[in-house]
């Protein structure tokens, strides 16, 4: 009985190890994850250190939208929740910085926050804020796809 199970398991592993099968299984898995993700209710989590305004509520009100956390650096602190109470006196004094070029762009347009120059990691921060760990899945997916492409190129080098 034990050998029968091991033999069947070996056949399954051998089938799954074929380079032409892996992308199919992976794409089915991704499709199921995305379908499940679309069916889940989505909402902003209010329990954040940087409270977020309702999406699009900052549009045409501040050039830093949607990245404006409030406050004026070193003058008026932003409204934040303390993760470490010992840092409460300095909390929210600096939530962002702008280079001179970024300051100039901010003064010229209301759409500065949606440009690539707005903050070095701003776009990635927003993606990570809304996805909560999806970056790990994305990075793993990119790595797996690169190995699939490499193995296909390696086995089909003729």
Swiss-Prot record:
Identification of the protein by name: Uncharacterized protein MJ0524
GO cellular component, as recorded: plasma membrane
Keyword Ion transport: no
Organism of origin: Methanocaldococcus jannaschii (strain ATCC 43067 / DSM 2661 / JAL-1 / JCM 10045 / NBRC 100440) (Methanococcus jannaschii)
Location in or out of the cell: Cell membrane
InterPro entries (alphabetical): Prd_NiFe_hyd_3_EhaF (IPR011313)
Sequence intervals crossing the membrane: 25-45, 110-130, 136-156
Topology class, membrane: Multi-pass membrane protein
Pfam family name, one: DUF2106
Keyword Metal-binding: no
Keywords associated with the record: Cell membrane, Membrane, Transmembrane, Transmembrane helix
Principal localisation: membrane
